[in-house]
Amino acid sequence: MKNVYKLNAYQISQEDFRLNILYQANEDGVQTGYFREGIKNGVPLIQVFGLDRMDNQQNMYPDGVFDFIDNASSVGGTIEKNKGVIYFPFVEPFGKDLREILQDDELADKYCFDSLYTLTISQAQQYPDKNKFYLEGRYKSSSGSEISLKAMNIPQGSVKVMAGGIVLTEGVDY
């Protein structure tokens, strides 16, 4: 699915979470958070792509900030904070859905990466003229230092913990 993007972290905290979408312009090489032309001229890309629809009180007024709505896979939100995954509300956000949003074939041909949805990642990277959108942000992540064994009354010393094929010593290595 190419409307789902991993942050490579787990247990994402909403506190201090920031996400922005940037576009690398051809003309001057400057990354911008908005289009410079068309009906979406000046509109933040985070809003264009449906990741900012509400303010922080959940009123339907975009505020330029990512809408941190957890449990995306079950309630239609924007993030799965436990898995560290961002969900765009469109199936093909950088392809046909953006094409519909722009409502201009010439601009759509310029900005849309339609073939992204039929190519592998390595193939898509071969099109630098189309591969110009970037996700940028910051987050805090935490994960527990304990692993649940889902068992009770486990005798001391009966658990083997390994890292890289080497048995670790309880009380020394962990």
Residue ranges of predicted features:
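Surface-exposed, low-hydrophobicity segments enriched in Gly/Pro/acidic/Ser residues
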Residues: 1-174
